[in-house]
Amino acid sequence: MEVSQEELTPLMRQYLRVKEQYKDAIVFFRLGDFYEMFGEDAVIASKILGITLTSRDKSKEKAIPMCGIPYFSADSYIEKLLREGYKVAICEQIGDPKTSKGIVEREVIKVLTPGTYLPEGVRENIYIMSIYPSKGKIGIALADITTGQFFLYETDKNITDEIERFEPKEILIPASFEDSLKFEISSYNKTFIEDWKFDYLLAYKTLLEHFKVASLKSYGAEEFSNAISAGGALLKYLEENKQQTEFKGIKILNLSEFMLLDASTKKNLEIFVSLDGSREGSLIWVLDETLTPMGARFLKNTLSCPLLNISEIEKRFDGIEAFCGDYLLREKLEKILKDFPDIERIALKIKGKSINPKELNSLKNALKRIPELREVLRNKTEILNSLYNSLYELNELVTKIENALTENPPPVITEGGIFRDGYNSTIDELRALRTESKKYILNMEAEERKKTGINSLKIGYNRVFGYYIEVTKPNLHLVPSHYIRKQTLANAERFITEELKELELKIMSAEEKLKILEQELFIELVNSILPFTDKILNNGETIGFIDFLLSLAKVASKYNYVRPEINEEDIIEIKDGRHPVIERLIQLGKLYEGRFIPNDLLIGPADQRIIILTGPNMAGKSTYMRQNALIVLMAQIGSFVPAKYAKIGIVDRIFTRIGASDYLAKGQSTFMVEMIETANILNNATPKSFIILDEVGRGTSTFDGISIAWSVVEYIAEKIKARTLFATHYHELTDLAFNLDCIKNFTVVVKEWGDEIIFLRKIQEGGADKSYGIQVARLAGLPLEILNRAREILHRLEKKEFQVFPIRARQLDLFFQGDPIKAELSKIDIDSLNPQKALKKLKELKEMLKND
């Protein structure tokens, strides 16, 4: 804004002082009931938010652009700006306009960023991540300020894997790494901050002060110097943005306890969204029958980080088994957990003193259910008894809140009406005064009507004029002389009297005192609850786990899942396995397949570590491979699985290479994407991994493709030794089973019926002898003419007639102009040619060839 200070109003000077401090944010500047934006902020915001751009002081040559939004609907606008990667600084009026001399005092109370904002109704974690690479290791701090989680850990693996594991809303990076990390995290919101904020000693001190400990040894964090640097920088960033940072403590993440799923695997297995981008058709869509926000978070987190610890997995199996075996228990739990509030986030709001009366009341109602919840779990099984013992009955806290709050307290602390009658004697007195005063108003209205003879006279109130007497125009001649005119309307006049002003002062004074007192007492109440927050948080975690187990038990019971066996062996054995999502879509009538055909899998023994899977398109190869990967994944989150029997040897990582659509938009060819993804698998897979490869080599020429696919399978067999499902159209690859003992051929069975094929969807040992491509093309609806021509070409190929195929006569008529040399040769009468003529004709033909 190129306007001199002298030309600016006091308000705009105040705004510019604020903007100077928060140059990297869009400032929401509170003016009455609106947040206003000015200058460049207004230009940006108006485009993103789709609101009208106007200007301040339009009469001046250098008018200042501005736009505004109502403060009460700010959340949706803030969310849009954050989604675009902007920060939003909330600048509030902290002074009272009634008592302020001159301009009202304003101050930025909070800076919202993509990693620190909780949109309405979002149940998942809102992670902010800080990374610090140094000396071959990457230090990572991960926090969710809405649930109080704070993790530190280090890795020497690809940083992209860690980002994709947690999908943070915002990533903090040292400014010096901007160029080197830009591409790896291009699709995430990132903030580059000064390198000195990652200084180890400064970060260490910041962590000690924040968590109020003498040493980080108590958290087992001492040895993770890079993670400490990342953690200290993260806390400083939150502090600078005036965010509450009430964390439960530091937790060190041990990556060796979790299976790693990269973005490609999550996408190809459709874990969180289907390939069309919707939640329906994904694995979480099938498994999520959670009733609480805590349970929903637990399920999503565990799907992102499946377990490698067998005893933890078995513990979850035990819980699901207990719930599956007792329908009445499940029913009781559902009634208790239904509509349960997010008590983890409420507890954090209590710690940060940002809780409102309505939320506190919902906490009270939830805590009242804990004794019943404990009773339902008591003395059932070992796992349920441990959950019973993990829950705290906070009856003292329930009584404290119940004695204080009304049945339906307001969502805003300034509204009043927070406390019950009888809770505080001063509140009772002020309420009585307010009630009596309103009676006085009604009495005064009746008296004034009687005195003046104006039956339509009424006493009203608005925020601008306060209380007033309103008289319609036909009755103005009856107005007494002591009435003071205040406002003229189209059909009436408004007046005040000295008596009415005195009464108004009494009422307004009582209202103001009442609101101030209720605010003070509410803050006192919240402070008195602070000692209970750790137990509330603990209850939230336990209820989340119970809800998670209950959800998986409901799904297992409804869809006939079984408890898998799980061990450290390398064998995966599945009897009558089913694809959990496709089976569900068929049940709902959204896929018209009749019924899902189950299939077996045995992979891992020395003679069957790699399966080469052949068969026509549409026969079910991809479904089969995906379903087995999903069954492994489900087992390792502790879920029952869709099969008659399953034995799963722990998998450290699932790799998938299917499709390439995401990268085509980035200008990479299909084949290049195949090779990049395949290289990633070959470089990172271990003997404990489970690999799914679909049509490797299809993006190049046939011989190149076969050669690459062949060598990839050989490399996996001889070097990596991972359990692998390899689907291919290259039937030549089935010869590998004769060269390498660890490979077996399997195919999808089809039945031929004349020119038609029937997909039986069954997997059996052996290789496919045909691709059935023409039959599949017929099913897809290709024109008959094309199908007939394809059969003709196929017949010639099968006879190894690789010469140029004759073009159909109809095509010759339209397009073929003939070969002139061939035409000339056909005209020659050999019997009538003497040697001289023959040499001459040969010379002509040679010239024609030259010209051609």
Swiss-Prot record:
One GO MF term: ATP binding
Annotated positions binding ATP: G615, P616, N617, M618, A619, G620, K621, S622
GO CC entries: cytosol
GO biological process terms held by the UniProt record: mismatch repair
InterPro entries in UniProt: DNA_mismatch_repair_MutS, DNA_mismatch_repair_MutS-lik_N, DNA_mismatch_repair_MutS/MSH, DNA_mismatch_repair_MutS_C, DNA_mismatch_repair_MutS_clamp, DNA_mismatch_repair_MutS_core, DNA_mismatch_repair_MutS_N, DNA_mismatch_repair_MutS_sf
SMART domains associated with the record: MUTSac, MUTSd
Keyword DNA repair (UniProt): yes
Annotated family: Belongs to the DNA mismatch repair MutS family.
Chain's role: This protein is involved in the repair of mismatches in DNA. It is possible that it carries out the mismatch recognition step. This protein has a weak ATPase activity.
UniProt name for this protein: DNA mismatch repair protein MutS
Native source species: Thermodesulfovibrio yellowstonii (strain ATCC 51303 / DSM 11347 / YP87)
Lineage: Bacteria, Pseudomonadati, Nitrospirota, Thermodesulfovibrionia, Thermodesulfovibrionales
The gene coding this protein: mutS
